[in-house]
């Protein structure tokens, strides 16, 4: 099984200089005086918005992934205090200092993977290594640099390090790509009022530089979190690059690593038009396990059981099409509450069994083959 979007590195954020468990190391962050405060804030946020209860712990560990029968984890690198830079006003452009911090987390993740006997994927051959495999992914274009030149150079380095995809937009506008509201505790209308974005800057100069560099090096563009106009501009740029290079569109898939079908009013989920454009390129939509997004337009109450959750996921699978759906759980991505019956990565095993029962002919595609198709295109 492949999880297209899982926050394995989140538990390492408490260790700025070295990988250490974030809960145990939260108050021992070194290097900056404000590090202790930021670590403490992250600890509280994890308990409020991520853990099942106050005394809970992380949902994704090597042991839990193994119990969940996840063979390939698309491991998402994200530095929350680069996005929510407390030293800068809202909507400020990225700073060059964010990129070294990203690399710091990447290297801490690789050390943790090696320590626990896993494999960090950097080449196509690594995908077929025995044991648990981890593929680097990045959430937030603000990590990539402060100038188009820096963004280009940094994307090239990330390609060399085996990064599968980059999600250019995220929770807050940082002048890279316009985003949609995604905070479960804040209605979309209130979010848009409190966190306004420039309506004329869907994809900025930094965003365009990122897409061009990613296209050149076959790092995939993840359109999750993007506002519809940013999605349109991203596809237009990629299609122009197809014409310029003569590349077959299916050789460069576009993905939405953690999203769903737009049944309701939330713009976070994908429109029919966007899903068709993803499908034409052979891309996939990873289904997010956040009740806030996945239930929108389908039910008003939370799912409580695995059976109820499978019924909801099936609505998305049928609407999108089983040949273009994967799992993109977003576990440990601050998505509390998660779907009923799915509390940790270990619960992916019973979910897989339920999907195999419901989709006997298509389950292997949903659980692995569709995601492997886009991963193979990246490393071809």
Predicted regions and their residues:
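Short His-Asn-centered micro-motif
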Residues: 76, 223-224, 257-258
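Exposed regions on extracellular, virion, or secretory-pathway luminal proteins
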Residues: 1, 202-203, 259
């Amino acid at each position: 099984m492949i999880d297209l979007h899982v926050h394995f590195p989140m538990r390492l954020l408490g260790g700025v200089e070295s990988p250490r468990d974030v809960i145990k190391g939260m108050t021992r962050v070194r290097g900056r005086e404000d590090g202790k405060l930021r670590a403490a804030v992250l600890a509280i946020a994890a308990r409020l918005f991520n853990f099942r209860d106050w005394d809970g712990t992380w949902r994704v560990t090597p042991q839990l992934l193994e119990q969940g029968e996840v063979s390939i984890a698309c491991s998402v690198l994200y530095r929350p205090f680069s996005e929510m830079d407390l030293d800068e006003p809202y909507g400020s452009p990225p700073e060059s200092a964010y990129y070294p911090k990203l690399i710091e987390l990447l290297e801490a993740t690789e050390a943790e993977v090696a320590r626990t006997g896993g494999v960090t994927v950097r080449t196509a051959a690594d995908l077929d290594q025995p044991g648990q495999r981890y593929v680097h992914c990045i959430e937030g274009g603000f990590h990539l640099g402060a100038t188009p030149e820096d963004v280009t150079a940094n994307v090239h380095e990330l390609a060399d390090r085996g990064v599968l995809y980059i999600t250019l937009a995220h929770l807050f506008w940082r002048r890279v790509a316009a985003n949609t509201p995604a905070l479960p505790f804040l209605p979309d209308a209130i979010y848009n009022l409190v966190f306004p974005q420039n309506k004329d800057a869907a994809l900025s100069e930094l965003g365009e530089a990122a897409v061009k560099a990613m296209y050149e090096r076959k790092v995939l563009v993840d359109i999750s979190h993007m506002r519809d106009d940013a999605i349109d501009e991203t596809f237009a740029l990629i299609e122009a690059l197809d014409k310029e290079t003569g590349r077959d569109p299916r050789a460069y898939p576009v993905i939405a690593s953690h999203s769903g079908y737009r049944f309701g009013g939330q713009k976070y989920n994908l429109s029919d038009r966007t899903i068709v454009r993803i499908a034409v390129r052979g891309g996939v939509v990873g289904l997010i396990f956040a009740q806030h997004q996945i239930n929108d337009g389908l039910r008003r109450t939370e799912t409580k059981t695995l059976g109820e959750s499978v019924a909801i996921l099936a609505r998305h699978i049928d609407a999108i099409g089983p040949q273009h759906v994967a799992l993109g759980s977003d576990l440990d991505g601050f998505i509390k509450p998660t779907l009923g019956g799915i509390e940790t990565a270990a619960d992916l095993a019973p979910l897989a069994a339920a999907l195999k029962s419901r989709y006997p002919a298509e389950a292997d595609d949903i659980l692995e083959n569709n995601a492997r198709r886009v991963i193979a295109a990246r490393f071809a």
